[in-house]
Regions:
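Short, conserved secondary-structure segments in the cores of folded domains
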Residues: 35, 47-48, 76, 86, ...
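Helix-rich terminal scaffold detector
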Residues: 1-8, 170-298, 302-308
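Short, glycine/charged-enriched hinge/interface segments at domain edges or termini
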Residues: 2, 56-222, 227, 361-362, ...
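Conserved active-site and cofactor/substrate-binding residues in soluble primary-metabolism enzymes
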Residues: 2-6, 22-29, 53, 71, ...
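Generic secondary-structure signature for well-ordered alpha-helical cores
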Residues: 9-20, 36, 40, 141, ...
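Flexible glycine/proline-rich
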Residues: 2, 23-28, 37, 83, ...
Length: 404
């Protein structure tokens, strides 16, 4: 039985990276994809001294003695709006009406807000002094030309897309989405639209796994149920491995008479690297390769399949796309109540993270075991209990893996 770290190392060592797996897409189609190129600023940002608000562009030296009772009186010599430039120079005793986002005219070193200004018949009365640079965003303060803006390996979020657009990236190189098939094994499974008969349950793992895989960037080709039949299991694996980069199965990976995934893989000639992992839940996790196709055999219980996916399959899918960060973030929080461990296996228990009195606390969810999909829906973290601990008492600091 492998330690989690050893199992993950084996999986990633046999998972291809994004080399020779890139494609160019439009920026509009890039959201959620993994960027495979460093992007540098092609200009200063802003590319000019920019007004932060509506008002008047002025020389601060002209307003040093301005008060409501003795306002400075300046001559209005023009107007400049966003998207236009003022073709002139502001001299002593002059001002230009300016709008938010417009370039500050030459000669001006401040923008005075409209609220302290009276303007009439070409005369601008300003009731307060200004400081040099007031209400101006200087050229290049956000980014200098040539600066690295977005690194290769980053996820293109809406915020990153805005940066890419700012610096002219109409097309971007991204990692190819791995194609993936989900197979849920078990004669007890029925489709979601069917009413289960005695001893049957609806197939929920297909939908959670397909959703997790899509969230990790995979292109899910198909999903379905495979009965507990050796020939059917072998045929389903062979057929899907021929069309997909990844085949992900749930169930059929333990030691029972109807756990047929490993025997089917062996007869197909797959190379099995991981068979059991010292973790709870998720111990009977399998990883293999059939040709160049990755095969993940995950446990059948919904919570077990979710934990195993996030610890093993998600990092592999992200590595295939060239992601720099492939693991879920970890933080520490104080246990709000006692947390049980499962030595000699590492435990991952669903919990809820909250902030109380300025500190992070995590509450273990009350759940009925690894089949309790209803409780797991409420979880936003996994509470990690090491292999050598029986648990934690309330108030102790624990490690948690963020799921959201």
């Amino acid at each position: 039985m492998l330690r989690i770290e050893d199992a993950l190392d084996l999986i990633l060592a046999h998972t291809p990276d994004a080399r020779n797996r890139s494609e160019a897409v439009t920026l509009a189609d890039s959201l959620g994809r993994i960027l495979l190129q460093d992007v540098f600023s092609d200009l200063d940002m802003p590319p000019f001294d920019r007004a932060r608000m509506d008002g008047y562009a002025v020389r601060s030296a002209d307003l040093t003695t301005a008060t409501p009772d003795n306002p400075a009186r300046l001559k209005e010599i023009g107007e400049v709006a966003a998207g236009k430039a003022f073709n002139g120079f502001i001299g002593v005793g002059e001002a230009v009406r300016i709008m938010t986002g417009a370039p500050v005219p030459a000669g001006a070193d401040a923008v005075q807000k409209i609220e302290v200004i009276n303007a009439k018949d070409g005369v601008v009365e300003i009731q307060e002094p200004t400081k040099p640079g007031q209400n101006i965003t200087p050229r290049g303060v956000e980014a200098k030309a040539g600066k690295l803006m977005v690194e290769a390996g980053a996820v293109i979020t809406p915020a990153a897309a805005a940066v890419l657009a700012t610096f002219g990236c109409a097309m971007v190189d991204v990692g190819v989405r791995p194609s993936l098939v989900v197979l849920s094994t078990g004669t007890e499974l029925v489709e979601v639209w069917e009413k289960p008969r005695p001893a049957q349950i609806r197939n929920s793992n297909t939908f959670s796994l397909a959703g997790y895989a899509q969230a990790a960037g995979a292109e899910v080709l198909s999903a379905g149920i495979v009965r507990d039949d050796f020939d059917e299991t072998k045929r389903a694996i062979a057929e899907t491995a021929a069309i997909a980069d990844v085949v992900m199965l749930s169930g059929g990976v333990s030691m029972g008479d109807y756990d047929l995934v490993k025997p089917a893989l062996q007869e197909l000639g797959a190379e099995i690297f991981v068979e059991k992992v010292a973790m709870h839940p998720g111990k009977p996790t399998v990883f293999a390769k059939l040709g160049e196709t990755l095969i993940f055999g995950l446990p059948g219980n919904p919570v077990s399949v979710a934990v195993a996916f996030h610890l093993f399959a998600r990092p592999a899918l992200l590595q295939m796309q060239g992601a720099k960060e492939i693991h879920l973030p970890r933080v520490q929080a104080y246990a709000a109540s006692n947390v049980k461990g499962a030595p000699p296996r590492r435990s991952h228990q669903p919990g809820r993270l909250t902030i109380r009195a300025g500190r992070a606390e995590v509450e273990p969810l009350k759940w009925a075991g690894s089949s309790d999909v209803v409780a797991f829906m409420q979880a936003d973290v996994l509470i990690v209990v090491p292999e050598d601990r029986k648990g934690y008492e309330a108030g102790e600091l624990v490690d948690v893996i963020l799921l959201r």
